[in-house]
Amino acid sequence: MILTHKRINVIAVLTAIIMLASQNGFAQAYVPEAGSHELTQKQRNKKPVEIDANSPNVLIIGDSISIGYTGHVRSQLEGKANVIHNPGNAEGTTLGLKNLQQWLGDTNWDVIHFNWGLHDLKHVTESGKNSNNPADPQQADLATYTANLKELVKQLKATDAKLIFATTTPYPKGVKPCRLPEDAAKYNAAALNIMKANNIQLNDLYSLALPKLKTLQRRRNVHFEKEGSKLLAEQV
């Protein structure tokens, strides 16, 4: 009987802790979305691209969305251009500032197609881990994103390559980690102002994908099905 009472008390305490955690947002534990790790690993496991010294060099900088369509772009331009994606996932502008010069290397790039935004606008904990809680801050708020992107553009312009900025692709409600659908348009608007001021060509993947999300994008996910990645590649 004593053990039974003790067990009841333990259950009551645990229940109270769970309820308190839920009220304070701690119950929204991060669940990684399908696609990002999978696409990044797939890219890393691919054989190095064979370089044709007589063909122009094209660098694609971006996150897992661009990793998803780079292979299709490479197929489309086979025999016409060397298409390279930056190693791994370019993630947000903070990582971009840290690694851009390394990604550029000493290659003479003819075209650089780039994007940042999807990781900047996602919500993270104070320690920087992905969060499903919209009350948590964004990885880079709009002001920080704007400042970072301006500096990245400055560095990219120094390469003398033809620059093309791809707008951040849209996504539905309920993606994990937390990204509010309306933020993609806000971050794109800030980016477009920077590109306009620097006479940089735009590739509006946001407008291309928006009316077709239900058929081309994974359910409650920022990543695209194979056909969706192919569609993006055709416009790239």
Residue ranges and their predicted role:
Residues K6-I8, N24, A29:
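Positively charged, low-complexity intrinsically disordered regions
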Residues L14, L59, L216-R218:
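A generic, residue-level signal for flexible/boundary positions that often mark functional hotspots
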Residues Q23-N24, D141:
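Generic detector of short, well-ordered, non-transmembrane alpha-helical segments enriched
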Residues I11-Q23:
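Bacterial N-terminal signal peptides
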Residues I2-V13:
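Bacterial N-terminal signal peptides that target proteins for export
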Residues N9, V49, K212-K214:
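Short hydrophobic/aromatic segments of transmembrane alpha-helices and their interfaces
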Residues H5, Q76-N82, L95-Q235:
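Alpha-helical cap/lid subdomain in secreted, periplasmic
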Residues Q28-I112:
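Serine-esterase "nucleophile elbow" of acetyl-processing enzymes
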